[in-house]
Structures are given as C-alpha cells and as structure tokens.
C-alpha cells in the first residue's frame, strides 16, 4: 500500500479504537471500498515551539538546547545523541480521556530487563482520565507518593537524558511536557549538575564539595543556631556570645518567633520574585530582601546575626542543583528549627536520625535511595566524587546492567601506542626512538 499512497508514515488499522485514537491525535484515515483495513497517514501539522536553550539547567560548557512540548521532537533529540540501533523507544498512551502519548526509552543491550518491565508495568496499569504533564505522571508511578523527597530525576536537557540512558536507566517522555523523567535515581544524583561530566574531574569535584556543604548548611544551620543560643551557650566563644546577647537585648520576641518570621518572610520574597515577570522579579527579590532586613533590624524586631543566618541559608539553598530536593530541604528545615528550640542538640539528633531512617528505607524502582552507600554495594568508591573521565570504567553497580563495563581498562590507547603499533612507550618528541617505531 505504500506504493499507492505517497506518504512515508502509513500504518494499517483494523480496530475502531485504534482508528479513533489516530483521528484524535491528528492523523488522516483513508478507507478504501472492498478493503477491510483503514490506512492511518501521519498528516498532522500542529504548531509547536522551536528548540530553545534550557531555562533552568543552564551550563557554560555543554549543549545549549532543551526539550520541547512535542514528543517526536524530543525522541529525535535523544536519537541524535544516542546514535545506536540498541536504543529502543516504545510508545504508549495514558489516560482514558486525553490518551496522552508517552515514550519509554532505554538501551536494550544495557538496561536491566526487570527495570524496564517494572516501568512499563506501572505505566500500563494507571486507571485515570487524564495526564497533562510529566510532573503528574511522576506522582502516580513513584514508590512512596507521600514522601516529599524526589524519587525520579526530571530534566529538560537531552544530553543529560542521553548520559543516563547510557548508564542503564530508563527515560520516560510525556507529550506536552518539556521535562522528561529518569528512573531509577539515588540521592547523589540530585546533588549532581548537568555540567559535571563536561568538566575536568578537579573542577567537578570542587563544585560537588561546595554543593555538599550547601546541603548541610541549608538543612541544619537555622536549627543549630536556635539550639546553641537556647541550650548550648557554653560552646560559643565568649566575645561572640556577648555580641549575640547584645544584638538580641532589644528584641522583644523569643528566638523561635524571630527565626520563623524571617524564614517565612524569605519564602514569601522568593515566591513573589518567581511569580511576577522576570525583569521585575529580580528587582523585587533584591530590593525586598534589603529593605525588609534593614527595616526589621532598625525596628528591633530581629537581631542582625539572625539576618545573616537566614541570608546564608537562603543563598546555599540556591546552590542545590535539583529544584525538588531544594523544596524538600526548605520544608524539613522547619522541623529542625522546632526540634532545636524544644530540645537543643538532642532534638536535632532525633530528627536527623528519623531523616536518615527515611532515606535508608526509601527505594526508587527497587533501587535503594542511598545506594551505593546503604547498602554498600560497592567495589566502586567513586559514587559521589568523580574520577577522571578515562577512569570511569564501570556503570553504577546498583543498576545491575547487562554490560557493567563501559570503558576498556586502558581507554587512551594512543598514549601507550597500543593497537597497530609495536611500540608500547609513551610518545615524546624528545625520545628519538619513538619516531622509528
């Protein structure tokens, strides 16, 4: 029939449900008398946004393009990065009313078959009317829907999605959403940036260390300040203690009211700066914080050192690469503040222990959230900090991939004259013997 209809994308359809589905997504259906088969011709021409640079995951050195709302554009972008016949892209629809098109992408020679089967099982067993975005789908297929911790990675960058595909993960694309879902994921994935693989390992590890410090400051600093000023003044140097007491002398409120008021005010400023148009939003954020902080100190509502604590905490929260992990830290931070006010270091220790228990019990598609640390899977001690690119020989062992090895033990064969040359010495212009090899 392709010889009769000059169209590249022609498919046979024999059931009315398939025919109606194709009509709804904009295909043209051709019926021929005396033939019991309809021909679905891809003739749709929806308007769509062109490929643009990433808005939220910007990098200095890396690809400057992002996913769009069109599923076929997104799959072609992934196919361009992973130009291999083993890349499988399976289509399915979700939602009894919207019939939203989704694509499940994986490398069939790398990804674990049980992982792929589990992802497809969850997607095919959703009894729901509509799915509009990948964020809605994420809430339906994650392991623990009541936990505020993110359990899947979400990205707008095709190069990041391609990197995770090649490591053995599964990528799910939802039509109408410029963000794709990557599964499974572990905790350290949320502290990694899309730019890390493009940097030398020294630079990337410095940034990873800074993010790790920012994580603990964002989580613990306000609670520790409350605990120390309320219960553990003896650990503060004498001069600093006198400065703190003097700064709080004219403040009429207890420390818990003071810090909660400033934290909530900071969250209000952050939310306001996001919701207004971008040129005004930056101005509101800067001016609002300056005016509010200065006025609060002059009116003796809060102490100057508390303004510093809240400002440092707010700045470090912006250093967390993943938006959803940053949200989780902003919520849990209030629990640490209250625990520090009620019981000092003991209260913070109890909340921290409970937090660790939650992290240890959480799974993402059967993979422990704290892998490869808990459980310790690992011959591989390069779980968080990155080794040099030439030394990243194995894929993550907790993914149980079909091909654990991704690089040869000696990947830079040119350096040792391996392959097609009998000289095994490193090349040097100063060594005349090399020129004769």
Residue ranges and their predicted role:
Residues 1-255, 365-394, 400-435:
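Cytosolic regulatory modules rich in charged/polar residues
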Residues 224, 237-240, 245-419:
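Generic detector of multi-pass transmembrane helix bundles and their immediately adjacent loops
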């Amino acid at each position: 029939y392709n010889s009769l209809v000059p169209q590249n994308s022609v498919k046979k359809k024999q059931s009315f449900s398939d025919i109606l589905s194709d009509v709804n997504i904009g295909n043209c259906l051709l019926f021929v008398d005396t033939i019991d088969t309809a021909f679905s011709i891809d003739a749709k021409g929806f308007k769509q946004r062109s490929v643009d640079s990433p808005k939220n995951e910007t990098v200095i050195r890396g690809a400057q393009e992002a996913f769009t709302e069109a599923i076929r554009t997104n799959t072609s972008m992934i196919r361009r990065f992973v130009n291999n016949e083993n890349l499988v892209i399976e289509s399915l629809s979700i939602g009894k009313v919207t019939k939203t098109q989704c694509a499940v992408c994986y490398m069939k020679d790398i990804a674990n078959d049980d992982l792929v089967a589990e992802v497809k099982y969850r997607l095919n067993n959703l009894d729901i009317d509509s799915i509009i975005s990948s964020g809605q789908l994420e809430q339906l297929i994650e392991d623990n829907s009541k936990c505020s911790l993110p359990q899947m990675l979400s990205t707008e960058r095709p190069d990041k999605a391609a990197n995770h595909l090649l490591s053995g993960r599964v990528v799910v694309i939802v039509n109408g959403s410029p963000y794709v879902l990557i599964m499974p994921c572990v905790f350290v994935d949320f502290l990694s940036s899309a730019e890390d693989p493009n940097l030398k390992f020294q630079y990337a590890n410095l940034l990873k260390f800074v993010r790790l410090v920012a994580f603990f400051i964002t989580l613990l600093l306000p609670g520790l300040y409350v605990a120390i000023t309320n219960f553990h003044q003896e650990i503060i140097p004498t001069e600093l203690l006198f400065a703190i007491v003097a700064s709080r002398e004219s403040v009429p409120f207890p420390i818990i009211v003071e810090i909660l008021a400033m934290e909530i005010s900071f969250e209000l400023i952050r939310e306001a700066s996001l919701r207004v148009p971008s040129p005004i939003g930056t101005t509101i954020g800067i001016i609002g914080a300056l005016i509010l902080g200065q006025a609060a100190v002059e009116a003796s509502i809060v102490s100057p050192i508390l303004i510093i604590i809240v400002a440092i905490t707010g700045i470090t929260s912006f250093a967390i690469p993943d938006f959803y992990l940053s949200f989780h830290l902003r919520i849990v931070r209030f629990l640490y503040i209250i625990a520090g006010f009620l019981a000092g270091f003991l209260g913070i220790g109890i909340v921290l222990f409970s937090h660790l228990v939650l992290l240890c019990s959480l799974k993402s598609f059967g993979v422990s959230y704290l892998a490869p640390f808990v459980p310790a899977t690992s011959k591989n001690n390069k779980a968080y900090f990155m080794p040099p690119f030439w030394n990243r020989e194995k894929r993550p062992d907790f993914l149980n991939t079909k091909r654990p090895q991704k690089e040869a033990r000696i990947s830079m064969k040119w350096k040792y004259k391996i392959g097609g040359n009998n000289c095994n010495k490193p090349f040097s212009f100063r060594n005349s013997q090399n020129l004769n090899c």
